[in-house]
Amino acid sequence: DRIEPTNWFVGMKNPQVQLMVYGKDVRAAEVSTDYPGVRIDSLVRLDSPNYLLVYMNVKDAKPGTMNLLFRAGKSKTNVKYELKARDMKGEDHMGFTNADVLYMLMPDRFASSGKNLKVKGLNAYTVNRKEPSLRHGGDLEGIRQHLDYFNELGVTALWFTPVLENNSPDHGKSSTYHGYATTDYYRVDPRFGSNNDYRQLVSDAHKKGLKVVMDMIFNHCGFEHPWVKDMPTKDWFNTPEWL
């Protein structure tokens, strides 16, 4: 059903990659590949039958799309997995310092482009600017359209609350508009836009001399994340009794 990370890169300092594979009964599978320069080092089988950790070494691999062959009994499944070339431009980037003036904002509450007010394929949600705890419809394009505003204020860095997918249904007049209930760590919430929209926003911000801080939450996730619905291991969460 899914492999995380969704792709990886050749040329990294650490050539080992850990893939978390999620799918029905995938724990029982053996995994192989004939992609040049890639070696499967080990498989780790977790408590849940629906997870498998695959450790690969890609030290001698070149960019391209590889086939991962999963075998379980008589069943065989080929899955494509992309190895991209490492973009070295980030080596020159500098993080924020005490010389920066940071402007923190919630993308849902800052500005709306009007493009992403109703997105299909998500759990039920409502956009209603009269309700303080429901979504108000702000998005990444709305922020991008107002980058000059930040220059006029004199700020030098933007800090958004998390923009990754929060696919939890509304509960009455309460929602996860704030972004702190991640359900996919590799996908921008489509109500804010796409991964490419985020890249474009960051690129345009840099052109205007603005740094961008990406807020990511790793010590908890949303109740709709697969890790909650089907825990990889019995001790995956420190306080599972809360679930």
What is each residue range found by the language model?
Residues 34-42:
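Short, solvent-exposed loop/linker segments at beta-strand-coil boundaries, enriched for Pro/Gly
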Residues 22-25, 58-60, 72, 162:
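Non-cytosolic beta-sheet module surface loops
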Residues 2, 83-104, 109:
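Low-complexity, Pro/Ser/Thr- and charge-rich linker/hinge segments at domain boundaries
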Residues 45-95:
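Extended acidic/polar, glycine-enriched regions
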Residues 27-31, 66:
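Short beta-strand/loop motifs in extracellular/secreted proteins, especially
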Residues 1-27, 85-86:
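Beta-strand/beta-sandwich contexts
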Residues 111-243:
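Substrate-binding/active-site clefts of carbohydrate-active enzymes
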